[in-house]
Amino acid sequence: MRAFRALLFVSIVVSASNSASAGNGPKGGPSFMEYEWTEIVATDFSTTERWEPRAGLQAVELHNELFVIAGRTPSPTQDNPFASIIHGDVWVSSDLGETWVELLDDAESAGLWKNRAYFEAVTKGGYIYIIGGQNFTTFIPAPPFVRPSEFFKDVWRSKDGVDWEQMTDDAEWAKLPKKTVPTDPPCGPPVTQGRAGLSAVSFKGKLWVLGGSQGDDLSINAGPDCRQVFNDVWYSRDGSEWHLATDDAPWEARAGGVALVKGGWLYFLGGEKGFTGEDDYFNDVWRTKDGMTWEEVTGPEGAGWSPRPGHKCSVVANHFVCMGGFAALDPFPPNFDTNPSDIWISKDGANWEKVSDSPWNNDPSYSDCIFATPPELPIICDHVRYDFDMLTVSGGKGGMKPSIFTFGGDREIFVPIPGNEFRIENDVWRYSPRE
């Protein structure tokens, strides 16, 4: 989760490129050498029949339908380099992402939840739950071109994506701890006590919330670093009342981690505690059976994949599968770090194998950015995306084998160039065994 860092600045089937031997699949199942990418629908800025290109969205499956919810779209403007369109819409697809129907145009205008991005959506017991997130709001005395974020502490649920019920407007996990590091000038009180970049999952009949952040980072705040990250764990039966499992998990406080369930364990993978240094990103993997007692399954060097936020992981064919993410620690020329172009798998979260260097059929040799002349022309590069969403889906037409679907995402870079706002997606891809 990128926490609104400053923005300075069909169907095609092709086999995924493999840079390492892709481990054998489960007994009787495919190996990842046999997986390929299918573009279900391509990015289209002109369409009105699908959700707009966006990042920080959420996608879930409920009753054999796919739902896409909210998120942010960068908006070109000369006055406000941070301007974004914040969505509160809900879309549904009954044909595995090929066509979409809008169920809700704008939740906030309808008197429901405020439009948001970098929140969590989880399904449990026939409901879609949305939890936390953030928005941009005008806030004085901030400069007129900076709009600090509002962080949300509410929980809503719906059976159909149309009618929503508020479970709480002040979740217990929103109790903000005091900041212990002094700043100059000092940090003022937060606009709200909610959090974004939190991780949520349904596990053992409960909703779980892990970590997250509150407050904008320096690139937005332009003042003291008032952003706080958390390492607490909470659970709830229905999102209305939350109970503390631990206020100090052994993993370092962070936002943008991935929470997954596999083999009776809740796993937590990667994330970030900031965007200014190499040590701000994580590639560790932890697991728990009760939310209180945790064990680290990776060694001192972490997982095989590089530390990153903005990534996504899912479970398919009895493996964790992780891809994407944000890795640009030095986003300016001549160094210009690029995002990781790789796919990694693991059965146990401890031992990882790289099975591809071309997620979404990306050409890894085309990842370095070339600056055009004159400088007002767009740059040429093919950054791998971050802040997309991903889930495992099975069934549908023809009894599809369990497959990974991805939705949208961000490829913006932190250089003031024309067209940067168009480096964002509303495509849908499937990563599945070759038929």
Q: Model regions: which residues?
A:
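Bacterial N-terminal signal peptides that target proteins for export
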Residues: 1-7
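Sec/Tat signal peptide C-region and signal peptidase I cleavage site
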Residues: 18-21
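Kelch-like beta-propeller repeat domains
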Residues: 23-435
